[in-house]
């Protein structure tokens, strides 16, 4: 009897995880709606979640006391409900966010590890713990980086929006990164005017092997 019950539970877990995998794919097709009001730019919820997670990971380097694993997991799931209710921008949020909490609760009920998801989501929303504040800061820094890219492409509203987002930052590390983002061109990581490669592209400069 125990073996039969175990097999049934295992089969149920596999079905739930399979459905979860497919559901997570919808975030790549769910647009971030704040850019509609900005008037330029496109971004999916999945793109946002990925960069938030990477920023949160980097912020842990500046805040060694933080639980890195908790931070990364929290960052990955902080907008998980948006696949069901869509992204809610600041105008939408004036009229409530209850649907998103319900969506996360329903997702949690549908998978064997749902308690972890719901607990992390609730902690992130409360923004009391160090880890939750780091994730929220990462969320804002991702938005700042997105806005800076739009500013450099010519959107005259983006700068003011970014300046407002900077004011929401809580942790010292995030505030320092925010200042750096505001004065660094989005292409600076790859485009170096002092690098002769961008002028003559001489293979000799790169020591390529034949």
Name each model feature, range by range.
Residues 1-210:
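Alpha-helical, largely C-terminal catalytic domains
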């Amino acid at each position: 009897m125990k073996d039969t019950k175990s097999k049934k539970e295992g089969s149920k877990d596999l079905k739930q995880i399979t459905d979860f995998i497919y559901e997570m794919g919808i975030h790549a097709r769910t647009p971030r709606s704040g850019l509609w009001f900005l008037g330029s730019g496109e971004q999916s919820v999945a793109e946002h979640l990925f960069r938030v997670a990477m920023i949160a990971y980097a912020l842990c380097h500046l805040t060694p006391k933080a639980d890195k694993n908790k931070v990364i997991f929290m960052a990955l799931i902080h907008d998980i409900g948006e696949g069901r209710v869509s992204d809610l921008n600041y105008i939408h949020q004036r009229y409530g966010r209850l649907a998103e909490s319900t969506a996360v609760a329903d997702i949690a009920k549908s998978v064997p590890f749902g308690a972890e998801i719901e607990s992390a989501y609730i902690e992130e929303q409360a923004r009391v713990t160090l880890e939750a504040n780091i994730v929220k800061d990462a969320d804002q820094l991702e938005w700042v980086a997105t806005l800076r890219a739009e500013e450099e492409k010519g959107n005259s509203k983006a700068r003011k929006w970014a300046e407002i987002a900077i004011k929401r930052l809580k942790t010292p590390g995030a505030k320092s990164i925010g200042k750096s983002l505001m004065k660094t061109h989005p292409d600076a990581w790859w485009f170096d005017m002092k690098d002769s490669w961008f002028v003559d592209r001489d293979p000799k400069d790169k020591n390529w092997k034949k």
